[in-house]
From Swiss-Prot:
Its EC number is 2.4.1.227. It is found in: Cell inner membrane. Belongs to the glycosyltransferase 28 family. MurG subfamily. Its main location: membrane. The keyword Hydrolase does not apply. GO terms for biological process: carbohydrate metabolic process; cell division; cell wall organization; lipid glycosylation; peptidoglycan biosynthetic process; regulation of cell shape. Pfam families: Glyco_tran_28_C (PF04101), Glyco_transf_28 (PF03033). This is UDP-N-acetylglucosamine--N-acetylmuramyl-(pentapeptide) pyrophosphoryl-undecaprenol N-acetylglucosamine transferase. Cell wall formation. Catalyzes the transfer of a GlcNAc subunit on undecaprenyl-pyrophosphoryl-MurNAc-pentapeptide (lipid intermediate I) to form undecaprenyl-pyrophosphoryl-MurNAc-(pentapeptide)GlcNAc (lipid intermediate II). It comes from the Bacteria. It is a peripheral membrane protein. The lineage of its organism: Bacteria, Pseudomonadati, Pseudomonadota, Betaproteobacteria, Neisseriales. It comes from Neisseria gonorrhoeae (strain ATCC 700825 / FA 1090). UDP-N-acetyl-alpha-D-glucosamine binds at T13, G14, G15, N125, R162, S190, I244, Q289. NCBIfam families: murG.
Length: 355
């Protein structure tokens, strides 16, 4: 068997899982072997095997805000999961582990440390997560998507995104020849964002019909009927879908996006070159979505609107002030932030550490 064996540690949310999948592809294209360490009964348990990657799981869940009993059990749980992770590393003869975040990353990383296996960390958010903060002390390489995610020195590589998004034409080429009302894409993630589903239709109803943007609105799971009913009741035309399967076309055709500010969303916006009205999820750990959003806003690639300030009236005021020229400028500024070779950069750093 040729190639080295890498263990990717990522779980809990798509923001950890999908960048790791992009790195897995980059490693496998180079002839290396990949296994995945995840949690039982998790998103990664449903997604990762579909990509032909061997999945190993630990019985571990989060410790933040989960009650005194779970925290009292933490030392025992950690001991048990670290031992299991050591067994997995030995079994597959892992030569380097790559941590992307999520509960499973810490016991997997600690197991690697105890076995003398090199650790590489990739942090997707502007504020480093708990597992990655701890593991960064032992990591051979610390990589991050946003400047200053860690207090110590590391490597800025961005967040891995799909190549077909990075390969979209530049904003000036996409915007050329566009006329009439703006076309706005609304996405709140695969589960949707209730506050966007409620407020966006109300805001559009406050605008004169002749200046209302054209809306392409992803409702999220099990929310399409209510969203479409709200638009209809307000007399506002919009194209609503439960889930957008072709995000490349959606990004290509949009003038602007209204969305949350998860790390993967920011990475895709910058890769595509799209400005955004960002409404960070207010309950994200360490308020990392607000920090993510500021990254784009500071580059004049969009606006940050805290959820506490999101009203139909405020949103209508913002939408009414926009024009295609401003959206194009935001899109061009967003594209300057893109780091399209992120997956390859992470893979090459890990290969060097495993040498």
């Amino acid at each position: 068997m040729g190639g080295k064996t890498f263990m990717l540690m990522a779980g809990g949310t798509g923001g950890h899982i999908f960048p790791a999948l992009a790195v897995a592809d980059s490693l496998r294209v180079r002839g290396h072997h990949v296994i995945w360490l995840g949690s039982k009964d998790s998103m990664e348990e449903r997604i990762v095997p579909q990509y032909g990657i061997r999945l190993e799981t630990l019985a571990i869940k989060g410790i933040r805000g989960n009650g005194i009993k779970r925290k009292l059990m933490l030392p025992f749980t950690l001991y048990k999961t670290v031992r299991e992770a050591q067994r997995i590393i030995r079994k597959h003869r892992v030569e380097c582990v790559i941590g992307f975040g999520g509960f499973v990353t810490f016991p997997g990383g600690l197991a690697a440390k105890l076995l003398g296996v090199p650790i590489v960390i990739h942090e997707q958010n502007a504020v480093a997560g708990l597992s990655n903060r701890h593991l960064s002390r032992w990591a051979k390489r610390v990589l991050y998507a946003f400047p200053k995610a860690f207090s110590h020195e590391g490597g800025l590589v961005g967040n891995p995104v799909r190549a077909d998004i990075s390969n979209l034409p530049v904003p000036a080429e996409r915007f050329q020849g566009r006329e009439g009302r703006l076309k706005i894409l609304v996405v709140g993630g695969s589960l949707g964002a209730d506050v966007l589903n409620k407020t966006v239709p109300q805001a559009l109803a406050l605008l004169p019909e002749e200046v209302r943007p054209q809306m392409y609105h992803q409702s999220g799971r099990n929310k399409l009927g209510n969203l479409q009913a709200d638009y209809d009741a307000l007399g506002v035309k919009a194209e609503c879908v439960e889930f957008i399967t072709d995000m490349v076309s959606a990004y290509r055709d949009a003038d602007l996006v209204i969305c949350r500010a998860g790390a993967l969303t920011i990475a895709e916006l910058t890769a595509a070159g799209l400005g955004a009205l960002l409404v960070p999820y207010p309950h994200a750990v360490d308020d990392h979505q607000t920090a993510n959003a500021r990254f784009m806003v500071q580059a004049e690639a969009g606006l940050l609107l805290p959820q506490t300030q999101l009203t139909a009236e405020k949103l209508a005021e913002i939408l009414g002030s926009l024009n295609r020229e401003k959206c194009l400028k935001w899109a061009e500024n967003a594209r300057t932030l893109a780091l399209p070779h992120s997956a390859d950069d992470v893979a090459e750093a890990a290969i060097a550490c495993a040498a």
